[in-house]
Amino acid sequence: MRFVNPLAHRVVGQPEESRLAGSDRVLAVLRSLGNYPRGVGLEQLARDVDVPKSSLHRALAALCRAGFAEHGERGSYRLGLEFVRIAFAYYEQLDRRQVVEPLLDALAARFGETAHYAELDGAEVVYLAKMTPPGRGTQMTSIVGGRNPAHCTGLGKALMAYALPDENAVAAYVEVHGPLARRTEHTRCEAKALAADLAFVRARGYALDDEENEKGINCIAFPLFLDHPSHPTGAVSISALVHRMGLAQIEEAAGEMRSLIEATLGAVTR
C-alpha cells in the first residue's frame, strides 16, 4: 500500500487557517457522501455542504485521488473502496459489536423484525450493527455506520435519558442543538415533551419511538449497561411496521425482550 505524506502538498506561505478550512471542507464532503449509499449528484452535495461548486470540485477530486470517493455514472459521487476498507477495519475492532451481534440475531429471529445496536455521538445515534430477518424485516433508511438525530429515535432516547437526567438538562440541550429536526408530525421537538419521554425511559427501562423518525415505523429500545452500571454503552432496538406491530403490541413485547437481552448478555438492562 502506498502512503502519501499529507505535508507534501502544503502550499508555501498558505495561512494555517486556510489549510484547516480546506481540510474541514473535505471532511464535510466525505461525511455527506456517507448519507447517500447509492450515490449523489453535485447539486445535492453543494446544498448539503453549503460550499461553492469550485471548492466542492477540489474536495471531490482530492477524495477521488485518495480512493475515498468514486465518480460514477451520470456524474454522481459515492464513497470509495479506501473508505470502506478503513471503515471495516474500525468496525472489526469493536469488541462491543461482537458482544451484541448474537443478541441482534436472537431478537430478529424471535420477533421477525429488524434489530439494531447504536451508540450516542453528540446529538446523533450511530448504527454499529443491524440484523434484518430474511423476507420479513422492515425496510428502513438505517445503515451500519449511518446516523439519525437522537431525539427522534428509540435508540437515541434510551441513551439520552441518562445523559440528560432532568428537565433543566433537556432544556439546555434543546437550546444548544435546537431547533430539533421534525422528521414526522410525531417527533418530539419541544423540551417539555422530550423531557417527559426521557423520564419514561428512566421509569420503565426502555424507550418507544411512535413513528417519530420514519412514518409507519415504530420501535422499542433498551439501553445496555455493558461497561458501567450507571452510564449506558449503547442501546438495542426492535423496529417494525405499524400495521404489523402497533405501538401497543411492540410495548407488550418489552418483558420478553428484556428477558432475551438478559439471557444473552446478562443483567445489562435496568
Regions found by a protein language model. Name each.
Residues M1-R97, E262-A267:
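N-terminal helix-turn-helix
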Residues H9, G137-K215:
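Short, solvent-exposed recognition segments
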Residues L104-G112, H116:
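Short regulatory alpha-helical segment in sensory/regulatory domains of signaling proteins that mediates
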Residues H116-A118, V126-A129, I220-F222:
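Conserved hydrophobic/aromatic positions in well-ordered beta-strands
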Residues V125-M131, G137-T141:
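Amphipathic coiled-coil signal-relay and dimerization helices
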Residues H177-P179, I261-R270:
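Cysteine/selenocysteine-centered motifs that mediate thiol-based redox chemistry or coordinate metal-sulfur cofactors
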Residues T184-E262:
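Extended hydrophobic
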